[in-house]
Curated annotation (Swiss-Prot):
It comes from the Viruses. Keywords: Cap snatching, Eukaryotic host gene expression shutoff by virus, Eukaryotic host transcription shutoff by virus, Host gene expression shutoff by virus, Host mitochondrion, Host nucleus, Host-virus interaction, Inhibition of host innate immune response by virus, Inhibition of host MAVS by virus, Inhibition of host RLR pathway by virus, Inhibition of host RNA polymerase II by virus, mRNA capping, mRNA processing, Viral immunoevasion, Viral transcription, Virion. This is Polymerase basic protein 2. A motif (Nuclear localization signal) lies at residues 736-739. The record marks K627 as: Mammalian adaptation. Belongs to the influenza viruses PB2 family. GO terms for molecular function: RNA binding; RNA-directed RNA polymerase activity. InterPro entries: Flu_PB2_2nd, Flu_PB2_6th, Flu_PB2_C, Flu_PB2_CAP-bd, Flu_PB2_middle, Flu_PB2_N, INV_PB2, PB2_helical. It comes from Influenza A virus (strain A/Brazil/11/1978 H1N1). Gene3D superfamilies: Polymerase Basic Protein 2, C-terminal domain. Influenza RNA polymerase is composed of three subunits: PB1, PB2 and PA. Interacts (via N-terminus) with PB1 (via C-terminus). Interacts with nucleoprotein NP (via N-terminus). Interacts (via N-terminus) with host MAVS (via N-terminus); this interaction inhibits host innate immune response. Plays an essential role in transcription initiation and cap-stealing mechanism, in which cellular capped pre-mRNAs are used to generate primers for viral transcription. Recognizes and binds the 7-methylguanosine-containing cap of the target pre-RNA which is subsequently cleaved after 10-13 nucleotides by the viral protein PA. Plays a role in the initiation of the viral genome replication and modulates the activity of the ribonucleoprotein (RNP) complex.
Amino acid sequence: MERIKELRNLMSQSRTREILTKTTVDHMAIIKKYTSGRQEKNPSLRMKWMMAMKYPITADKRITEMIPERNEQGQTLWSKMNDAGSDRVMVSPLAVTWWNRNGPVTSTVHYPKIYKTYFEKVERLKHGTFGPVHFRNQVKIRRRVDINPGHADLSAKEAQDVIMEVVFPNEVGARILTSESQLTITKEKKEELQNCKISPLLVAYMLERELVRKTRFLPVAGGTSSVYIEVLHLTQGTCWEQMYTPGGEVRNDDVDQSLIIAARNIVRRAAVSADPLASLLEMCHSTQIGGTRMVDILRQNPTEEQAVDICKAAMGLRISSSFSFGGFTFKRTSGSSVKREEEVLTGNLQTLKIKVHEGYEEFTMVGKRATAILRKATRRLIQLIVSGRDEQSIVEAIVVAMVFSQEDCMIKAVRGDLNFVNRANQRLNPMHQLLRHFQKDAKVLFQNWGIEPIDNVMGMIGILPDMTPSTEMSMRGVRVSKMGVDEYSNAERVVVSIDRFLRVRDQRGNVLLSPEEVSETQGTEKLTITYSSSMMWEINGPESVLVNTYQWIIRNWETVKIQWSQNPTMLYNKMEFEPFQSLVPKAIRGQYSGFVRTLFQQMRDVLGTFDTTQIIKLLPFAAAPPKQSRMQFSSLTVNVRGSGMRILVRGNSPVFNYNKTTKRLTVLGKDAGTLTEDPDEGTAGVESAVLRGFLILGKEDRRYGPALSINELSNLAKGEKANVLIGQGDVVLVMKRKRDSSILTDSQTATKRIRMAIN
């Protein structure tokens, strides 16, 4: 009060008023304002006040050589007075106008490259289609979404290194560009931005937009890929939505989508192999998505989906601490529980051993089409508030929550036996047994659950066992809400462990994920997925298995041939022959294998019966565990194209056709590759030509190591000896000649020598 009186008193004196209104603000005030590092309290006032001055801008001295002192109207553009406290010139806003009209014009060629993300956005919007506006209640839930279409997926640190390398290549500082994507981007950008005159800082900001994924936690109803998020403000309000089809796709959305499909295929395939974890890792490491190694994408891409997270866990990467059940992501928001094993009886009197969670807990459940809040105690559902896009989605959420609650009335609602199996034909664990059972038909479950009268609460409504809404009654504890439940925003990642059956656990031993949680939904990937692993051959059906198996043999023929003669058992056990077995009728697999192995043994024993084409053709059949029998076959059956097709033991067939003239193999009419060596028997001449420059010393001598193929001989030094595998599948010892003169006679003597050495 006192101070206000004092101020009033001062203001009543005319001298005070004069001082405050007439005196110019000295530069000290401005310097103080600049240098005291406080947040600007009134930016708009400050701006107006600065711009009201004659020279609000300071510029480098060089500006005086580039801009005249006065413009055409005779107005002063810069002051001869130096800016106090710096050696810069004070400049009028009119100088900016002059520069824009008369300043030098630089090349605009770099603009579209620097502002790439903006130019692309304009194109997408130009070609996008906006549909009708619908007025309806919007169930929005906050989700972590990608707000920056068209970016690469580098981490902030990786991007920083790339930007420094591109924009400030000569700056000091350790920069290590390791990942493939970093190197590719750096090279590409350096080329694009040669002679670029745009300010480096601006270039750096724009590059950041292009390289790093930016996510925000936004309320969304509808599409969550980045090309939808960029028009979120145009497509959904509080009570309306506008239909929109993007005018283009961006690679980051395609990568996310294709990654999910690849991960699902790999987890499903690994789950049925003998060692799921090893198989999964082998497949992740040998798969490419859109030309980039899948493991590189997994390291950089933050997509959270069950299969993707299983792959990440296998690679030792951190994943989200929420767990998955019935396709919903559960996040505990309060409470705690301990686990205890308990035996329970189903309505069919089948005994189930379930791990009961004892204690009060609250969860958020987030699925693709429905969300819920669940409060539960030990084997009791207290409250479930669901919201979903349609009735079907709401049913799914209720079933999952009821099973998860482990209530007795749910277990007693089971009719019939529970014997669901996974893809590897192993019984599912009890909780998933119950889930599958009620997902098939929830009628009894809902009927047995019980109903209760409800209070009228804003935005909530009851739901009856037959899924009709009601304001009077509802299934016990269950309510349907108009509002969605937000996804869990915390993006913390935790260290997890994974066992060989691909069950992922947190450090307290709670199972977060298992292959049962991986969706069976099939989609078509946007980017090409290349699975190099033989385990994925069957993804495109039996024909692909057949073609891929033979392609593999032909590609690796040099090593296969040596193993065939020296270590056949190891060859038969190769995992590349595993998928082929599913094509051979089960009842006869063993006989085929025994027959082919015997045939091969005869080839090894009897000189001159080595037949490349026949070995390639029959080899996959030898991989099954053999049954000894006297049976002979003239053709072998494989199940492709919905029926049994025959492969002739001698000669060509539609399934396996080798053209001697072109040396091309076609399998079911598809090209399976070219044989690089002549598989015809009567051609000892080929060997003799190849062995020119080598002396044949006699039979194989194990002291000189494993047999080399003819192609590998060229590496020998003069006078060096080695065993070599020749066309008939026999091994002889040779020495590289010390002199070149006698080479001509080699080819004539080679043929005789080979015969002698073998006999």
